[in-house]
Amino acid sequence: MNTEATHDQNEALTTGARLRNAREQLGLSQQAVAERLCLKVSTVRDIEEDKAPADLASTFLRGYIRSYARLVHIPEEELLPGLEKQAPLRAAKVAPMQSFSLGKRRKKRDGWLMTFTWLVLFVVIGLSGAWWWQDHKAQQEEITTMADQSSAELSSNSEQGQSVPLNTSTTTDPATTSTPPASVDTTATNTQTPAVTAPAPAVDPQQNAVVSPSQANVDTAATPVPTAATTPDGAAPLPTDQAGVTTPAADPNALVMNFTADCWLEVTDATGKKLFSGMQRKDGNLNLTGQAPYKLKIGAPAAVQIQYQGKPVDLSRFIRTNQVARLTLNAEQSPAQ
């Protein structure tokens, strides 16, 4: 009778109350139980008050209760009904398995992104190449146009400057064509004269001399005079080394150009006169003289070396950009575009 009453009384008590009564019968404090079970005092207090901490999993709570029961000598089978109420097992949340189709979809999206990136890159490269080609083509067309203009100007000048026949049929004075056989005074030959003018040789009255415009501008002082045809036999020749003829001084504004390859160029002086316009071949030299400043247009700057006032002209900026050089050489030799 007493055993059944005790059993019914134990069933009426909760798990926490039974553990607390057993602890008190053994004379243990909550601190002692907590130290033996390596738990916090607050956890032991919650177990005795039948509280389930929210931050503690039910599996751990059931294990703590079993350890507490073994410590106070209470069979675990008697506590199982109370454990189901105090610490019920919670169903674990199972994360849904990721399907492989999601990875394939992401790979497909990444593939489209890479394709679009490469497409944009190819478009940028194509536009850059097209821009460079158009610029290069425009430069070539400009050079061709300047060469055509130069050819047209040269052809028009050649049409206007056709050969002009000079009528030399007029009879010349015998006194000018022949010299009497008189002795030449040596004292007269030692006298320096500013210029020596020789009579023109006798020509056939029926023969016409043809002189082009470019030959008409040649300085007659630089042309050698045939004195043998006008000096009779026995006459002493004039000493040309004592004639007092001096060579002209070099022009300080002279423009010297040496060509390492074929190159088209145009040179204009301050008066607007074109000193040269046309094509120069490889290994050619060009010496120009005019009124400074000079305006130059050079189709291939890398193919020409320019010296102005004895100093080289820097064309590196035009060579780097590979474009037609347009520059002005002033008296201070500072090329400006």
UniProtKB/Swiss-Prot annotation:
GO terms for molecular function: DNA binding. It is found in: Cell inner membrane. Residues 145-218 are annotated as: Disordered. Residues 30-49 bind DNA. This is Cytoskeleton protein RodZ. The chain crosses the membrane at residues 112-132. It is a single-pass type II membrane protein. It comes from the Bacteria. PANTHER family: CYTOSKELETON PROTEIN RODZ, PTHR34475. The helix-turn-helix (HTH) motif in the cytoplasmic domain of the N-terminus is involved in the formation of spirals to maintain the rigid rod shape. As this protein is anchored in the cytoplasmic membrane, the HTH motif may contribute to protein-protein interactions to form the RodZ helix, which is localized beneath the cytoplasmic membrane. The C-terminal domain may be critical for determination of the rod shape by probably interacting with enzymes required for synthesis of the peptidoglycan layer, including PBPs in the periplasm. Cytoskeletal protein that is involved in cell-shape control through regulation of the length of the long axis. Residues 19-71 form the HTH cro/C1-type domain. Belongs to the RodZ family. Residues 1-111 are cytoplasmic. One of its GO terms (biological process) is regulation of cell shape. It comes from Shigella sonnei (strain Ss046). Its main location: membrane. Residues 133-337 are periplasmic. NCBIfam families: PRK10856.1. Residues 145-167, 208-218 have a biased composition (Polar residues). Keywords: Cell inner membrane, Cell membrane, Cell shape, DNA-binding, Membrane, Signal-anchor, Transmembrane, Transmembrane helix. One of its GO terms (cellular component) is plasma membrane. Signal peptide: none annotated. Residues 168-207 have a biased composition (Low complexity).
